[in-house]
Amino acid sequence: MSRNDKEPFFVKFLKSSDNSKCFFKALESIKEFQSEEYLQIITEEEALKIKENDRSLYICDPFSGVVFDHLKKLGCRIVGPQVVIFCMHHQRCVPRAEHPVYNMVMSDVTISCTSLEKEKREEVHKYVQMMGGRVYRDLNVSVTHLIAGEVGSKKYLVAANLKKPILLPSWIKTLWEKSQEKKITRYTDINMEDFKCPIFLGCIICVTGLCGLDRKEVQQLTVKHGGQYMGQLKMNECTHLIVQEPKGQKYECAKRWNVHCVTTQWFFDSIEKGFCQDESIYKTEPRPEAKTMPNSSTPTSQINTIDSRTLSDVSNISNINASCVSESICNSLNSKLEPTLENLENLDVSAFQAPEDLLDGCRIYLCGFSGRKLDKLRRLINSGGGVRFNQLNEDVTHVIVGDYDDELKQFWNKSAHRPHVVGAKWLLECFSKGYMLSEEPYIHANYQPVEIPVSHKPESKAALLKKKNSSFSKKDFAPSEKHEQADEDLLSQYENGSSTVVEAKTSEARPFNDSTHAEPLNDSTHISLQEENQSSVSHCVPDVSTITEEGLFSQKSFLVLGFSNENESNIANIIKENAGKIMSLLSRTVADYAVVPLLGCEVEATVGEVVTNTWLVTCIDYQTLFDPKSNPLFTPVPVMTGMTPLEDCVISFSQCAGAEKESLTFLANLLGASVQEYFVRKSNAKKGMFASTHLILKERGGSKYEAAKKWNLPAVTIAWLLETARTGKRADESHFLIENSTKEERSLETEITNGINLNSDTAEHPGTRLQTHRKTVVTPLDMNRFQSKAFRAVVSQHARQVAASPAVGQPLQKEPSLHLDTPSKFLSKDKLFKPSFDVKDALAALETPGRPSQQKRKPSTPLSEVIVKNLQLALANSSRNAVALSASPQLKEAQSEKEEAPKPLHKVVVCVSKKLSKKQSELNGIAASLGADYRWSFDETVTHFIYQGRPNDTNREYKSVKERGVHIVSEHWLLDCAQECKHLPESLYPHTYNPKMSLDISAVQDGRLCNSRLLSAVSSTKDDEPDPLILEENDVDNMATNNKESAPSNGSGKNDSKGVLTQTLEMRENFQKQLQEIMSATSIVKPQGQRTSLSRSGCNSASSTPDSTRSARSGRSRVLEALRQSRQTVPDVNTEPSQNEQIIWDDPTAREERARLASNLQWPSCPTQYSELQVDIQNLEDSPFQKPLHDSEIAKQAVCDPGNIRVTEAPKHPISEELETPIKDSHLIPTPQAPSIAFPLANPPVAPHPREKIITIEETHEELKKQYIFQLSSLNPQERIDYCHLIEKLGGLVIEKQCFDPTCTHIVVGHPLRNEKYLASVAAGKWVLHRSYLEACRTAGHFVQEEDYEWGSSSILDVLTGINVQQRRLALAAMRWRKKIQQRQESGIVEGAFSGWKVILHVDQSREAGFKRLLQSGGAKVLPGHSVPLFKEATHLFSDLNKLKPDDSGVNIAEAAAQNVYCLRTEYIADYLMQESPPHVENYCLPEAISFIQNNKELGTGLSQKRKAPTEKNKIKRPRVH
């Protein structure tokens, strides 16, 4: 209670009729210590009149009722009478909890939970808090007890190793119940052992390779210790497989299903130690075979342990042989490096009395150990305070090598990072001595850290003390100096007088540990250096003594205010660790910063800046001193207290991380909002997710933002949350939408995340000067983001060096250093190498001499433009771009530097799955070259996850990514994007994509883009085109190409019109050549006047409406599509336009196919105004080289009439400018017509075919009025999202159910499967469609006719060659039953495949619902139960005896068969649907019913009277009887 508070503190006892004796006892005991003037006894009526929290202490008994709920809702401080008695008795303060406290049974207990469902966890938290305990969500040192639902989590393992009690949730429930009954006063009154978490709780254990006795023992012990034993290995059920030897079918399946494969040692160690052990220590993997191949292709001597280094080790080229010592030294060294580890397994770790911080600062990776050895070493590292890494990366400082080192060799070859590679003996010696030993005597011979040569290596302080005794003294290497000098002389021939020392790069790679770093600069190996250059190099290297003493907050003083004592001391320690100074309130010195909580507090002292703990943590995270004004969270946030305007809001954050995200989450919770990590459309109670209402982000982009747009949810800036906090009212979202925010606002918000140094004063903060120095050593290309091309970076770098003034916080350099591309750059694993071109002198020579004031201007003469253009051309020719640039760019006027056009995958962030780790570097490089960003591990910024796997993959990584809703694509998506140099649709590349089963994507993409974008192109080019009503073929081509090129460049295509024209002409020429090739391959005599190239003159007889233009383009694209589908040759993208002659490989097979295609193409001979060209694609089926097509290709094929080409007459009175088209009986929607200029036409004209049927506009409109209600099946998540959005956009509905819904009209199926949803759709006669139907609808812009896209139609089955026999049967069944049932419906009979059936089901309860839905969807009546009276009514009885549980009550099958009921196995239902003629019932009869069937046959009474209904209707219903 602060002194400034005017309001007195009252203790109020709530009197009611239900008060217990304990209530009055508490009142008496408090009177002894508290003055009665501050004690009040209030009635329930008075309590209900309280309208706000008056900061009094309320004593309630019981903890229920209207009054209790009222006070709790107001946030009043409520305790039970037992709390008062306990506190009086133990002289303790009443807890200041934000929640009611009933008693103090758990007053000294702090719990954390693991592996509990959300509801259970919240219940545990509630009871613990009501019993005076504390709850932490994270496991930390303060936690005293862990409540576990099952074993195996990280919390569980840590708590078990720390010997913290791990108990069941029932312990909390029992404590609460006993305390309610007043039977206990402390948690220790109950025996905790009764509630201890069993060792194998939640484990389902299976074994392989064990003998019978061992297997039985494992089974008994598993059940005894709370686990479950399973004889069969079942996917998604078994959690552990105990393996004798790593081989066998169970072992292989377990590995694929991500089941823990462990040794028996894991099982018995867990029982011995009393808790479930970490499975990773006991992994069973086949021992890798020792490789006998040499590490280098260069012949070496027999003893090559030290010489077997690869080129990636060499960063100082002049000292390659510096560490090649004599063989005698090698032998003596090797004898030291091979420690004897036989006794390591039996080592007693507890025997060491080493300090807890012995390995402080060591980041250690263990390589080549397994079993007990690995366990012992891990325990040693943990006890010594070291950080143990599970993955070898550049953060590791020490690698301890054991029996094999294959993984280390790969890392050593790929990475320039050189950790200390030592044997286990070094670790054991450190622990036995009790202090850190020098690594040098223990370094492994094959892994010498040679990026700093041995003779020049900066030594640690420990090494300096022992320098005299070290075998690596300088005189040992005197003979090698001559070789070094020779290398230096040789290298100097290529340096052209360069004064750059290679050690400049080395100084960046490894931090200096001592002031002796300057010594190598005066060494004899650098005699060729000039004197003044030595001084410039030494200027680059800062003094070590200054580095060690300075920190981020050097010379800065701080006041810490408004925090609890614990938090205040933690913050003070952090500031001191970063060289800051903590001031006391009594000090007269003005502090630079006052650190306060996010919501602020009263600061009476005079300070320079008032900042929040968010600012402090962010500065430390980025090691940069930020300007407090750069982010609103860096200064106290004004909040209207007591207001919760966001109570009904569920908020998700995007593009926020670290302290910033934590602060925003705290602020949102304070305002009453719920914050969740996932952005979801619908609530999911099982996963504890609520439907999101708001997305807060910094800039447009990312999967969450796209989802928000799709779902019409507000995506707002952080300012919306701050404004809501300031006013206490929910701010209007429309004023804070991310779309409306300016670029400056967004960039300001993203500065923290991108780590921009906003206020780094170098004079005051030499620590930041060190960072600046390090940046000057590397090349100025943006090596991390990979967003700019190398050649542009060179030119822009030169302009910045000459024209731009130094940025704030960066020191002026006396002389900029050159940036040599050393091997350590271009062999770096994590970076894409881009060569740096030194064109400074060349550009300087081109500058026009002028006055001194003009010298700093950027050269902008036409010659410099030529250089840039030719560099662009060189890069374009060396990479596989989709469209080659012109070989002769025209000289333009000097232009100011423009912003670079975004690359195809701009704003895409990819992450490659661990499953494809071998290809990760390669794929990351490709992504970077396309303008994408990449992440080594998955985080919330990732938009595309690259994965390859099965349709229902159980991989944990895949599952977790799938829940995030990002694009999951195949690696071939990225490869094809690079091939096409464009952003291809992700839906065409699911993670199951197999290129061997598909045709070229580029054909699909081009055709689809042309069709979908043409209309907008026509309508938007009125100013550009002289006459938009008369379009020639080439105009259409140009427009489509222009659209494709301008789409990614955001409208910058106008400036590149010449380049686009050149590209268009080139594309047209390539197409002409390919068309000529096709036509020349055939021996067909050409009609008179027919040409082999596209007509440039065109034809003016095209329709004068935009719609007809679109129709024209659509017809033409279908012809081109047919050509694309028939040829697989792709023109060389590197061919320049000037190269008229191409050297190609003559493929005779391809020539034959082109001839076959040409023979199938029947060109019309009359340029009729409304002629439509259609290609016969059915003959393509005969090709032995046919491959399955993609969905959009199938869609375009199916739109074409598979019949011969027809030429129809133009209608005299077109209605609404739509054409009446002759079609087949299948009622196709009229296909748009192509103009006559699509291909050259010959004379004389061909006579028109007779019309079969005309569809009028009225019929079409009637057809469109029908309902479109879809269900989706066997599609991946990306396709589901895409198609749901498409269907809703076209006016249809989507039912998102796992099971079949009879109200649906269409079901789109990825693959025909024998599952409930598919079979039920077949039985109900629904449209069962291929996904290409939706692609066709997307292209047409409305729902099209279904026949050609139906599973079972020839247009689908003929192009899908990869489906098996069962899938084909299922597909044909769908079409057959749909036609049957539709015919019956047309005749007025509404029924399904099973109409007339009255079924008794005798199946397992878990499967009964599925069978029931299936039968009912086909019109069957399912009778309740299987009692004898029902046999009179029933026609069929289906039973699945094999899968019934033993305790299921039986059914009298013999009695049913006697009453002429078909008693069949359940397989009959699916086969009845799939087979063309109904299957014979005898093949499916249950054993008990076979004799009755045979008797009926002999007597000739195949059917009972109940099956022989006299009506015609029953004859139709029962066509299957034999």
Swiss-Prot record:
Domain of life (superkingdom): Eukaryota
Modification type Phosphothreonine: residues: T298, T779, T848, T861, T1062, T1064
Tissues in which the protein is found: Highly expressed in heart, brain, placenta, lung and kidney.
GO biological process, one term: DNA replication checkpoint signaling
Domain annotation BRCT: ranges: 101-189, 195-284, 354-444, 548-633, 641-738, 900-991, 1259-1351, 1389-1486
Reported impact of K704A: Decreased interaction with MDC1. Does not affect interaction with phosphorylated HTATSF1
Biased composition (Acidic residues): 1024-1036
Induction notes from the record: Up-regulated during the S phase of the cell cycle. Up-regulated by E2F1 and interferon.
Keyword Lipid metabolism: no
GO MF annotation terms: chromatin-protein adaptor activity; DNA binding; identical protein binding; phosphorylation-dependent protein binding; protein serine/threonine kinase activator activity
Matches recorded under InterPro entries: BRCT_dom, BRCT_dom_sf, BRCT_TopBP1_rpt8, Secretoglobin_sf, TopBP1-like_BRCT0, TopBP1_BRCT_1
Family affiliation: Belongs to the TOPBP1 family.
Cited function: Scaffold protein that acts as a key protein-protein adapter in DNA replication and DNA repair. Composed of multiple BRCT domains, which specifically recognize and bind phosphorylated proteins, bringing proteins together into functional combinations. Required for DNA replication initiation but not for the formation of pre-replicative complexes or the elongation stages. Necessary for the loading of replication factors onto chromatin, including GMNC, CDC45, DNA polymerases and components of the GINS complex.
Listed name of the protein: DNA topoisomerase 2-binding protein 1
Organism listed in the record: Homo sapiens (Human)
Organism phylogeny: Eukaryota, Metazoa, Chordata, Craniata, Vertebrata
